A protein has these predicted regions:
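Short secondary-structure boundary/capping segments
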Residues: 22-26, 136-138, 191-197, 240-247, ...
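Beta-strand elements within well-structured catalytic alpha/beta cores of enzymes
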Residues: 3-19, 34, 59, 116, ...
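Polar, surface-exposed loop/tail segments
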Residues: 317-330, 458-483, 490-492
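Low-complexity, glycine/alanine/valine/leucine- and proline-rich hydrophobic stretches
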Residues: 390-449, 457
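His/Asp/Glu-rich, glycine-adjacent segments
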Residues: 55-203, 327-375, 394, 404-408
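A short beta-strand-to-alpha-helix junction
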Residues: 261-275, 288-301, 437-470
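Active-site-proximal N-terminal segment of extracellular/periplasmic enzymes that hydrolyze or transfer
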Residues: 1-40, 50, 464
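Secreted, luminal/periplasmic, and some membrane-associated catalytic domains
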Residues: 26, 42-45, 49-51, 73-101, ...
Length: 492
């Protein structure tokens, strides 16, 4: 028996229902052959915010973005701003600042690249621990992204990822991380079911086919775990709400990208995806390092809260109380998520359930909450909002857009006709395909990390949130790939 390997393919922005439909109609033959059993094709819940970058971290660390202090693809650090020392206390990973991601999340947390040093990384913005030779797209990633941004030729980048993936096998690696970006970007540019997006799914199928043929040629197939996952889903966007401009229209002076040279600001709006946003609020005339708790937001910014809830573009808003509980508001009601420790939560509602669950009040562990909410509009909503507020960079108010809307308008070039980042199922439910069968239980993307370590025979580091889901034998399968619409939408 040869030593084991793992190849982790991030099929960026792929939807499980679209994959299921294309497999059922015979349009993805290589993927169907590579993952032939239902136990090899599972739904999983991603993390909030459901956006590239922060949503890579669960795969590579087994932890949530909030626990790693990377709460969005754009963030503002009010604690660092109050101190005014060191690096600028804000980021946008849409561009050259993506090269700062490795230094921006917790330094004490090992990545798969650290644990499996014979590694290769292809087009990943998170690659801390990968050896120099294994960073196969290093500086060239920015050039390829710039080329595709101005030409819309993401197909060329997808093919380049395929070539680099196959070339990485020459290194005899134990772990390969490969991002395939074209489904996501063609979805943004058109629609998640447009002809260009579907063509990108077919190119993904070609990549899987060539990879498996090469594994067979090298006689590595039986000892290689191939995992194909998505970091987020996608849904059509018909209306944009420019949240920073909307805040300015209400009398605020917001700091936001790309207008980062403004220093006379009383708020900050950091949009991710573009389906979610952090809103930071200044107390009085000076910025203080502590987050503004829910009690003060209600007292001093009640008009803002009410105005946000009146907007049809906004589905959920959340704040954090001084006692650590997260308050969730929507037009349907108010909920409180109280962490009790050891992965347990108390959930209560007032005036209706903001998530629309109904009947979920009480004390739950995280796994049971996931199981109870998996088929709802907001799968894993309480757990995901609570983890996000672990980060001191998380806003005083967290906003999740409604389906069909996003939160960035005039400064998004090119315009997004499909998006992600929000808390609803369209963006949170993703495919997890594995050549080793997975158990018939609710899954999260944080589970990928410990499952890979199990396959590789490595111990799981302390503090990991995810669960090892590797199973050698399974009961008959009943799960289906849930799409963003309903469990019945899938062709799996």
């Amino acid at each position: 028996m040869q030593r084991k390997r793992t190849i982790l393919i991030i099929a960026d922005g792929t939807r499980p229902d679209v994959l299921g439909e294309l497999i059922a109609t015979g349009e993805l033959p290589a993927i169907a052959q590579a993952f032939p059993e239902r136990s090899m094709r599972r739904p999983a819940v991603s993390v909030f915010p459901s956006t590239t970058g922060p949503a890579f971290l669960p795969f590579l660390t087994g932890m949530y973005p909030g626990d790693l202090n990377m709460p969005g693809i754009r963030w503002f650090d009010r604690r660092a701003w109050a101190d005014r020392n060191g690096d600028p206390p804000f980021r946008s990973y849409v561009g050259i600042e993506s090269y700062r991601m490795n230094a921006d999340f917790r330094r004490d947390v090992p990545t798969l690249f650290d644990i499996l040093p014979r590694s290769a990384s292809i087009f990943s913005s998170v690659n801390r621990g990968v050896p120099f030779r294994g960073n196969m797209t290093g500086l060239s990633r920015a050039l390829w992204w710039l080329f595709a941004h101005w030409t819309d030729r993401w197909d060329v980048v997808g093919v380049r990822a395929r070539k680099r993936l196959l070339a990485s096998l020459e290194m005899d690696p134990e772990f390969v991380f490969c991002l395939i970006p074209d489904v996501d970007n063609y979805s943004h540019l058109s629609h998640c079911r447009s002809e260009r997006a579907i063509a990108a799914y077919r190119r993904l199928d070609q990549t899987i086919g060539e990879l498996f043929r090469e594994l067979e040629r090298r006689r590595w197939r039986e000892d290689t775990l191939v995992v194909m996952v998505a970091d987020h889903g996608h849904s059509a966007v018909h209306t944009h709400l420019g949240l920073p401009e909307w805040m300015a229209g209400r009398g605020f002076k917001p700091f936001y990208y790309p207008r980062i040279w403004n220093r006379a600001f009383d708020s900050a709006v950091m949009v991710s995806g573009n389906g979610m946003a952090h809103i930071h609020l200044r107390r009085g005339s000076t910025w203080t390092p502590e987050r503004v708790p829910d009690e003060e937001v209600v007292r001093d910014f009640s008009a803002l809260l009410e105005a946000l809830l009146e907007r049809r573009e906004i589905g959920i808003i959340a704040t954090k109380r001084g006692d650590g509980a997260v308050v969730v508001r929507s037009r349907s009601g108010t909920g409180v998520v109280t962490p009790l420790g050891e992965g347990h939560f108390q959930y209560s509602t007032r005036g209706g359930d903001p998530f629309g669950y109904g009947g979920l009040e009480g004390v739950w562990n995280a796994d049971d909450l996931l199981e109870e909410t998996l088929a709802t509009r907001y799968p894993d909503g309480p757990v995901q909002l609570e983890q996000l507020f672990h980060s001191p960079r998380t806003g005083d108010i967290v906003v999740s857009a409604e389906v069909g809307f996003d939160l960035r308008d005039k400064h998004e070039n090119p315009e997004h006709f499909s998006g992600h980042g929000a808390l609803h199922a369209d963006h949170m439910v993703v495919p997890w395909f594995s050549t080793v069968p997975l158990p018939d239980v609710p899954l999260r993307t944080v589970d990928v990390f410990p499952t890979i370590l199990h396959w590789m025979g490595k111990p799981i580091p302390p503090g990991v949130t995810g669960r090892d889901r590797l199973a050698s034998s399974l009961e008959p399968e009943h799960a289906v790939m849930t799409g963003a619409q309903s469990a019945e939408a899938s062709a799996f």
